[in-house]
């Protein structure tokens, strides 16, 4: 977390001359500023939003579903920034059998004036990078038959830049490995709703209101169990596991294109050591909690050797830029601080 703190400070310096707000979007299993008391996703023991604000920046932190799909997360981010009732879209909600406009997801807006004349910089970590690109995709397109503020019309120019840190632009082999060896994990998420109204949600909220997983007051546990057991979330592609997989990321990359009017910055990271056989093992700077997944990625035979270098969760090669299924990559170049045009 310390290294990310300094990365954020260096990124912020790029925006020092322009008074454009900065939006922070967390990654997979992330949390908001009012959760995990005393420990911030952005900054650890230091509240990065508060610190950057004290330095003269206008900064806002969104809190989106920690295990939700990028479509759902992007919609949540939009309404948290702009303000209004979250609306996942009629056709998307019908396709995946979710609540289109969940109660409790209506916001005053962190930056209500957001539009093409008042764009934002978006800084992200991990899955947050995919979420930002999905938000950009939704803003740039008009979806026929939709009436929501986000989906009904094109909104070009609303984003000035997108910065990604350790983002699985092309997915992570870890998602594939977990789905293969631990398929029950996604099935278990159906029962996370039982925590929604408990003290646990005050510390960490899975934010799955759209899936209607909450136990009703007059509902017996057996009825609740039967209802939730049949929830489509267990096998749905409207979920982080699909978006973070190599196949899911590739599917999104095929419909996504970068915008020549938007600046993109990607910060690939790693914390492994290469061995003679081209496999990778964790270095001493990596958290012990990430050693097991890091070794799974670093020794996987399901990918080329270049995918073995990783940060414990994502292969470094996947963090650079999006690549489509035909092998075509989005325009990219090595960062030059003297020339960012």
Where do the model's predicted regions map?
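Helical cap/lid subdomain of alpha/beta-hydrolase-fold lipid enzymes
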Residues: 137, 141-341
């Amino acid at each position: 977390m310390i290294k990310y703190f300094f990365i954020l400070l260096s990124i912020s310096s790029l925006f020092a001359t322009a008074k454009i707000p900065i939006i922070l979007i967390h990654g997979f299993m992330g949390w908001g500023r009012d959760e995990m008391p005393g420990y911030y996703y952005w900054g650890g023991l230091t509240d990065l939003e508060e610190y950057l604000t004290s330095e003269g920046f206008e900064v806002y932190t969104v809190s989106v579903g920690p295990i939700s799909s990028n479509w759902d997360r992007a919609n949540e981010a939009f309404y948290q920034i702009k303000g209004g009732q979250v609306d996942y879209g009629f056709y998307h909600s019908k396709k995946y059998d979710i609540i289109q406009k969940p109660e409790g997801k209506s916001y005053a807006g962190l930056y209500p004036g957001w539009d093409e004349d008042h764009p934002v910089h978006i800084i992200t970590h991990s899955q947050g990078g995919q979420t930002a690109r999905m938000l950009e995709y939704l803003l740039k397109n008009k979806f026929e038959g939709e009436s929501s503020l986000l989906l009904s019309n094109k909104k070009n120019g609303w984003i000035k830049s997108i910065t990604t840190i350790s983002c699985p632009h092309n997915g992570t082999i870890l998602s594939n490995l977990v789905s293969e060896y631990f398929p029950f994990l996604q099935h278990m998420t159906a029962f996370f709703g039982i925590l929604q109204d408990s003290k646990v949600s005050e510390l960490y909220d899975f934010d799955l209101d759209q899936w209607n997983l909450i136990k009703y007051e007059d509902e017996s546990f057996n009825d609740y169990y039967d209802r939730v057991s049949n929830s489509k979330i267990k096998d749905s592609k409207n979920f982080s596991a699909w978006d973070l997989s190599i196949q899911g990321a590739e599917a999104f990359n095929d419909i996504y294109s970068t915008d020549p009017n938007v600046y993109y910055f990607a910060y690939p990271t790693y914390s492994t050591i290469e061995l003679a056989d081209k496999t990778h093992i964790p270095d001493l700077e990596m958290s012990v909690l990430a050693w097991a997944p890091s070794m799974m990625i670093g020794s996987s035979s399901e990918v080329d050797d270049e995918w073995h270098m990783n940060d414990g969760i994502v292969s470094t090669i996947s963090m650079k830029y999006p690549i489509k299924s035909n092998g075509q990559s989005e325009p990219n170049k090595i960062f030059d601080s003297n020339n960012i045009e």
